[in-house]
Curated annotation (Swiss-Prot):
Keyword annotations from UniProtKB, A to Z: Amino-acid biosynthesis, Branched-chain amino acid biosynthesis, Cytoplasm, Leucine biosynthesis, Manganese, Metal-binding, Transferase
SUPFAM superfamilies, alphabetized: 2-isopropylmalate synthase LeuA, allosteric (dimerisation) domain, Aldolase
Described function: Catalyzes the condensation of the acetyl group of acetyl-CoA with 3-methyl-2-oxobutanoate (2-ketoisovalerate) to form 3-carboxy-3-hydroxy-4-methylpentanoate (2-isopropylmalate).
Pathway membership, UniProt: Amino-acid biosynthesis; L-leucine biosynthesis; L-leucine from 3-methyl-2-oxobutanoate: step 1/4
HAMAP family xref list: LeuA_type1 (MF_01025)
Protein name: 2-isopropylmalate synthase
GO terms of biological process kind: L-leucine biosynthetic process
Phylogenetic classification of the source organism: Bacteria, Bacillati, Bacillota, Bacilli, Bacillales
Cofactors named for this entry: Mn(2+)
Domain Pyruvate carboxyltransferase residue range list: 4-266
Amino acid sequence: MRKINIFDTTLRDGEQSAGINLNLQEKLEIARQLERLGVDIIEAGFPASSKGDFQAVKQIAETIKTCSVTGLARSVQSDIDAAWEALKGGAEPRLHLFIATSPIHMKYKLQMTPEQVIETAVESVKYAKRYFPIVQWSAEDACRSELPFLAKIITEVIKAGATVINIPDTVGYITPKEYGNIFTFLSNNVPNIEKVSLSAHCHDDLGMAVANSLAAIEHGATQIEGTINGIGERAGNAALEEIAVALYIRKDYYQAETRLNLQEIKRTSNLVSKLTGVVIPPNKAVIGKNAFAHESGIHQDGVLKEKTTYEIISPELVGVQSNSMVLGKHSGRHALRNRVEELGYTLSDEEVNKLFVRFKELADKKKDITDDDLVALIFEEKFDHFKDFYQLSSLQVQYGTNQIPTAVVVLKDGQGNEIQEAATGAGSVEALYNTLERCFKTSVTLLDYRIESVSGGRDALAQVFVKVRVNDIETSGRGTAQDVLEASAKAYINAVNRVFMIETMRAENQKVAMQ
């Protein structure tokens, strides 16, 4: 059975989704979970694009031990140099080089002739091979490229030392039959193509990213690129969890397999969703909450008699737990730590101590603490602190029928100074956000607001997700609390803190550029 390598680009292509801005700690946590999932390659970022991306790629490369870490680079020496400095400490450094090959890109974006594009591609691969044992070369917009030219340039980059050839459907234009035919054409028209790995990278603009990826496997691809939950620019990328499960369920047809630990899929999906703020649609294949629900009476009757009548994927296959351990106010620190580790999270002693305090506070108000509650507390303690920016000290909201809602908020800034403001609004949340905007002394546009319960019951934790725009920066934020307004405030502060973090990084990058 053929082995298919899984190339995860959640941290690079996935993060290009509008409003997703992950900090270093969040990227590291996702990378660790991808390692537990068993992906073969993690594309950690674009090292030359910014100081922040460089540091993230470097730390991920030095942290991850059981899979290869790569970074993206344009076909210029400075990008390749930056990528090597970021990746050289990894277990298996590899580079992902790209240049556009379609007529429209060569003419309008690159403003280069086809001959110049070939020369640039060859020289960049030769230069990269001085550093990297594995060089992946991508033909950007390959699916709108002329096939004879595509075969010609691939022939030359293989001669120059490329070890993986990637065929991206950059704009989500191709159909499965056409995409498969490209791989067949290249296999028949590129000398020595059997000496390299062929890779597929599909976007979902026409809703065919997963189907196209599977078609590529049928026609010789041995590496598939995609993201968790299919997140990515525009309509997103191929959803890796769907491809992996399709290969597992239909191994009789595809005769191919991955090395993914499928039981880690749900946990990985939830982690990415919570950290990015991108909600998982309930009808999402493999990991949506309705994926294993049966509404029809006929279906329910069949499933009760024999699950396989209507259920081709068992919830347990992808790590959906039928039950979870419940902790309470009498649970100790040791039980808490054990459960945190069983859930797949690594916390320092200091983080466990802080989490235990939050856990006890919640246990005094809520009888049973479920796994979902615990994960929400972990996220708040581990990822939601921006020590150099704003933190919520207290809030008070006055609301009554036929009264104007009024909010009073006290924040602490990065220097420990208290800021107190008050404002009114048409509703409690608007009053709260108007007050916070005064505290920030900057104009904030709320683009999206979403609330959900973490678990069931009247005493359930509330989790709020927001998306905001400040100047030209869009970010998302999240907040968790038993009180809806407190969760709303935390989410808003979290999102705006991310804006300030990005502005700080931009300023640092400008200083470096001027030196």
